[in-house]
Amino acid sequence: MKRVVTLVSKEQAEVGHRFRVFSVPDECKSCRLFSVCLGRLTPGRSYKVVEVRPSMGQRCKITDSEMVPVVVEEAPIVGLLPLNKALEGVVVTYEDECAGCEGCPNDVVKKGEKVKVVKILGRKKCRNKEFAIVEFFVVSAPSHAVLDSSKTAQAPSRAPSSRRPLK
């Protein structure tokens, strides 16, 4: 899994500590440390600290706490997928089929994103449908066609604008 160096509070700087980034406060975006702190992480994703590096004395502009450089890797998301998509090692398109069911990951995964199933944990029934409870990672963003499905793309015509009879 991809590893990223970022900053966390001294209290979180412990190997094995897991955390989730819910959103990025506006105050962070103007901070000089943003690009090496929350700017490297994706809101909605969970991370696990795998290495702690020596502190360089940076302080958080919001909490005024000491920030410590750490290496994190994205932790898998646990959620529901239809049984026909729940195969370990397979990359599938998330289509939000479980919307409205408890355990549906639509708060952290967008419709159209490609996800890689890493582990099947069990089964769950919701609205008379069977789902698999799985661990997965998001591997790519949704395609433009899914993001903007209200507009239909049409390829330009290759036919000549007027046909004249051949002589």
Curated annotation (Swiss-Prot):
Task: Please name the InterPro entries in this protein's record.
Answer: UPF0179
Coiled coil (residue ranges): none
Disulfide linkage: none
- Say which family it is in: Belongs to the UPF0179 family.
PANTHER family in the cross-refs: UPF0179 PROTEIN MJ1627 (PTHR40699:SF1)
- Annotated HAMAP family: UPF0179
**Name this polypeptide is given:** UPF0179 protein Pars_2336
> What organism is recorded for this protein?
Pyrobaculum arsenaticum (strain DSM 13514 / JCM 11321 / PZ6)
